[in-house]
Amino acid sequence: MSEHEPALPYRDASLPVEDRVEDLLGRMTVAEKAGMLFQTMIAPGPIDEANPHMGLASGEHMIGEQLMSHFNVLGTAPDTTALAEWTNALQERASRTRLGIPVTLSTDPRNHFTDNVGTAARAGAFSQWPETLGLAAIGSADLVEAFADTVRQEYLAVGIRLALHPQVDLATEPRWSRIGGTFGEDAELSAELVAGYIRGFQGAELGPQSVSTMTKHFPGGGPQLDGEDPHFAYGREQVYPGDNFDYHLIPFRAAIAAGAAQMMPYYGMPVGTEHEEVAFAFNHGIITGLLREELGFAGIVCTDWGLVTDTSIMGQDMPARAWGLEHLDELSRVERILQAGCDQFGGEARPELVVELVEQGRITEDRIDASVRRLLREKFVLGLFEQPYVDAGAASGIVGRADFVAAGEAAQRHAFTVLTNVEETLPVRSPRPRLYVEGVDPEVAAAYGEVVADPASADVALVRMQTPYEPRPGGFEAMFHAGSLDIPADEVERLRALALAVPTVLDMHLDRPAILTGVVDAVAALVASFGGSDAAFLDVVFGQALPEGRLPFDLPRSMAAVEASRSDVPYDTEDPLFRFGHGLTYPSGP
């Protein structure tokens, strides 16, 4: 829009939002409306350059030619000034489209430790907190709200206005690869924490200082057949052998009550329920019948990424996740998603398909308008038309601010969960003990004791490990930790031998509920963590910080117990080694 063009009603901030929406909607072509319905990935960099590695067109093409205005920012951000300058460049390009509709930028979580292009980015310059499982281990809704408020400020500083989270799936199937992003197994705890999460990001109501939230994955991922993930065809079935479908809705009801602005359905298809056996975003009974009509959700529904177009991610061929409807062509997939009641297509850039559906009379323009209204309304409410740009020079003073970093580091320490502590091994009180370390940076450990190479000469061994998993092939698929939760037998033998030679503190990072039966009786202390630095771990070991964590899920005793459990039922493995809520503590200080 030319700066010399007379002011248009949709540009007038004094008018009611609904009036501005209707004015702008009435000026839009079908192609412009279609562009609104797509949100895909974009990576910081020159906006006129494509990203073939991720199969992405350039920002210039998507904004200028495809008329898109919603993008999911990929990757860790080491330089927040550069990130803010890049978001401003996108907004400047959007300002030169016919109607000057500003861009809405979104992100997966980027304030934790996980780095997976499909689910989260490592914190980088942002404050670093425990994973959401760690927040659940602490169990304080006030802390979760403070976390979300901190992240809100960091997002705003670089122009990110939509959080593709929280993830409130319930960890009732211990093998599932996405547990690390949840609040654990308990529906009531998840419901309590998600309310604080949404308050912290959005405030009492959505406005210019808010970051909108997209709660996922409706109606609750987690009960996956054999724990396999529906990003992939072999994991497409979502099962309810315990007839416990409604249990998984509890956190979503809480999110809606807290004002959740957006909702994302999961990839899976329900099997053996009253609902049609097609993926949730294609499922009219789930989106319109359950989410819209029964639960009363009036916000934006955006599909999970990649339901329409076959693509390649990180060199791995990825078929469209049109589970139960794989036989449909792309045009019919788009039609079914719109008929189901979704507003936006995640991970897709195919507005021409919507235009074709309207031209063929298969989808009415009124139906498109209903979704565009919701999407435009949020842009207006967030104040993007008044202030699309950020102060790039100020970004680095807000992102990673000292008090934000300190709060994240304190939460890391509090989230550590002590499972066993034989003869009060913890905290280690010996001055400058000899330390044998595995999985711990020796340079960091050297500040706490003398690091030695031979366990036999050590006073204590400190070992940090990841939850076991069965590696999968492929660039993208390999990033999802699935399969067995057992520590391999040879590793159990090695750890037991180490623990026999020297008192051993074993810290297991739990992105899934590991089976620790083979080592629990051998180590001097067993600790669970959910995203914590080596310094945080050592502070807990040496009593300089107080561990406050309680398990956010049961830890099963065996894989046989996992395999025999019902995927949709919490606390269902027989005779678990440790129960939900277990955690020991001890006084801090020297």
Language model regions located:
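Long, compositionally biased
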Residues: 57-65, 395-405
